[in-house]
């Protein structure tokens, strides 16, 4: 019988496949796939960042403007979208690819009320929304089929090659 164990530790997902009743730990975990979040994922984290100290500054990526911006506060937590300096934020976020399927839904502006589809990374499904007709982002598909085809197999994780002795 095979068992699957999953662990998430500091943005790295460990998935171990093993056998029940094996005599040694080496036999119990015969295969291990390790995944880590793509480097740009922290830039898109929507969770609210809170800072313990209001002294000094930190930087975070503004998904609406597409730029890193300085914010008040240090010793921040709560979300992954915070960096010690503007330089570190720029290095991580400004040139990072942002696949359409990774973007949050953007309803746009206007009164067109166009039915469209977007990929919801939380549920890994294509969902319908009403598009205003102006601006928005590339996570905006004309049909559910186009959304599913574009985002098929999309993941915020990448496989890391590891050799286990």
From Swiss-Prot:
Keywords: Blood coagulation cascade inhibiting toxin, Disulfide bond, Glycoprotein, Hemostasis impairing toxin, Protease inhibitor, Repeat, Secreted, Serine protease inhibitor, Signal, Toxin. Saliva (at protein level). Salivary gland. Residues 1-26 form the signal peptide. In mouse model of melanoma, ixolaris labeled with iodine-131 is able to recognize tissue factor (F3)-expressing tumors and demonstrates anti-metastatic effect. One of its GO terms (biological process) is envenomation resulting in negative regulation of voltage-gated potassium channel activity in another organism. It comes from Ixodes scapularis (Black-legged tick). This is Ixolaris. PANTHER family: ACP24A4-RELATED, WAP, KAZAL, IMMUNOGLOBULIN, KUNITZ AND NTR DOMAIN-CONTAINING PROTEIN 2. Residues 43-93, 101-151 form the BPTI/Kunitz inhibitor domain. Glycans are attached at residues 90, 123, 161. The lineage of its organism: Eukaryota, Metazoa, Ecdysozoa, Arthropoda, Chelicerata. Anticoagulant protein that modulates blood feeding of ticks on vertebrate species. Inhibits activation of host blood coagulation factor X (F10). Inhibits activity of host coagulation factor VIIa-tissue factor (F7-F3) complex in a factor X/Xa-dependent manner. Prevents interaction between host coagulation factor X and activated factor VIIIa (F8). Monomer. Interacts with host coagulation factor X/F10 (inactive and activated). InterPro entries: Kunitz_BPTI, Kunitz_BPTI_sf. GO terms for molecular function: serine-type endopeptidase inhibitor activity; toxin activity.
């Amino acid at each position: 019988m095979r068992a699957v164990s999953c662990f998430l530790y500091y943005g790295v997902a460990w998935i171990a496949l093993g056998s029940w009743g094996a005599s040694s730990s080496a036999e119990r975990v015969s295969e291990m796939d390790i995944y880590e979040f793509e480097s740009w994922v922290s830039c898109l984290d929507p969770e609210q960042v809170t800072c313990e100290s209001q002294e000094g500054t930190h930087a975070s990526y503004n998904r609406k403007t597409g730029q890193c911006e300085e914010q008040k506060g240090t010793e921040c937590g709560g979300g992954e979208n915070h960096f010690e300096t503007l330089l570190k934020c720029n290095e991580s976020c400004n040139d990072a690819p942002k696949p359409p399927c990774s973007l949050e839904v953007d309803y746009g502006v206007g009164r067109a009320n166009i039915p469209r589809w977007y990929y919801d990374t939380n549920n890994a499904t294509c969902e319908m929304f009403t598009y205003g007709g102006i601006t928005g982002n590339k996570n905006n598909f004309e049909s559910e089929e186009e959304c599913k085809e574009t985002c098929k197999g999309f993941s915020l994780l990448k496989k890391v090659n590891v050799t286990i002795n």
